[in-house]
């Protein structure tokens, strides 16, 4: 076989022309210490704060401390098999979570990985967990109500779409029950609900998933779970991940409700990480920026302006207090960040008033603008009447003889307190709340025994539903109590009361 030297030369020239001289550079470092979910890495000269790092065994980490000669990282997975001397690579990205419609009805962890055994999540869209909050220009004022279905809240402490309303109270006062009822009440209202469980028991999360599934609420809900068994870094990331998932829907013009249960455990997880990274401790051993971790999370809740799609993200953070102490560090921080708080009291809870809302110190700073006019008309004096009742009840304990007017107020107060009680998993539509509260506030219950109030309420709603169905529809549509509606309503109440008193 005869090969000409020119042919060989041309083949070699072609191969040289084809050759692409590309050098792939990776910022890498060496582990000098690992343990307790944190690691120190030497090298990583171009590392950024919050950057996602690749450790051996498919474990990821996040850079938090950028020091002169090393980088302090937290591990977002199991540290088994990771040892001193291993190579760590920088990714140039920050932590992202999958977002999209595919997440609805699913249970995921802080990194968006499925936990419910229903197979992988089919979405190719991701979003960084840390995003800048919408600016003042991008927002509009809170002007639409978010109905919780709970009489005590929708009447006196109304919540608007895009608001941040803190739910605060001791353990076992019904904080989670209150938010689950709120989620159940969003059925058919085109609101996507996200429940973020931080440091909860796995059994508690499983119970919540079962409840929402049974009630048909998982069709519009997402659960982000980071249980007590997860590491502190994963618990720390959970609320930010949930918030990013919610923002995706908000940016599409949808309404989203997100619950953080609870931020006390979130602060404890951050404190654990900070102390392990040897950051200087401050008050109650929390690091100096513990206020900032909550403020930057809750500032992402917003009602967007029409130009930006008009979507909203309403946040209900939960804080657990110790012996009702709302002056502790984390409770005061979160109270100052949010637009109001609902305070739940163990004394009220134990005395049978559930939901155990203390109307005296609970407040909604912006929700009043969002409350429907019909509810405003009905409950204008409700808070004042309850306050007067509490004062009189305390005075009456001393057995003093009360005048006729005071006795009347006392009796009315008892009935108002009774009417505000509500069973769990039974949220009420706003028009039904208006009917019930109108009855109570306008003295239609004065001749009904206190112990019969619950029965009266249930049967009155059934009666109105059967004989005056258009009344509820009118209130829901017009959102205001016209003289015509009031007259019809009073006729219905008087008619039913006659029947009820005859049966009694």
From Swiss-Prot:
Principal cellular location given in the protein's record: membrane
GO cellular component, as recorded: plasma membrane; proton-transporting ATP synthase complex
Keywords carried by this UniProt record: ATP synthesis, ATP-binding, Cell membrane, CF(1), Hydrogen ion transport, Ion transport, Membrane, Nucleotide-binding, Translocase, Transport
Residues that, per the record, bind ATP: 169-176
Record-marked site positions (Required for activity): 362
Record EC number: 7.1.2.2
Catalyzed reactions per annotation: ATP + H2O + 4 H(+)(in) = ADP + phosphate + 5 H(+)(out)
Compartment(s) of residence: Cell membrane
Enzyme class, spelled out: translocase
GO molecular function: ADP binding; ATP binding; proton-transporting ATP synthase activity, rotational mechanism
Topology in membrane: Peripheral membrane protein
Keyword rRNA-binding on entry: no
Function recorded in the entry: Produces ATP from ADP in the presence of a proton gradient across the membrane. The alpha chain is a regulatory subunit.
Quaternary structure note: F-type ATPases have 2 components, CF(1) - the catalytic core - and CF(0) - the membrane proton channel. CF(1) has five subunits: alpha(3), beta(3), gamma(1), delta(1), epsilon(1). CF(0) has three main subunits: a(1), b(2) and c(9-12). The alpha and beta chains form an alternating ring which encloses part of the gamma chain. CF(1) is attached to CF(0) by a central stalk formed by the gamma and epsilon chains, while a peripheral stalk is formed by the delta and b chains.
Family in the record: Belongs to the ATPase alpha/beta chains family.
Protein name according to UniProt: ATP synthase subunit alpha
Lineage: Bacteria, Bacillati, Bacillota, Clostridia, Eubacteriales
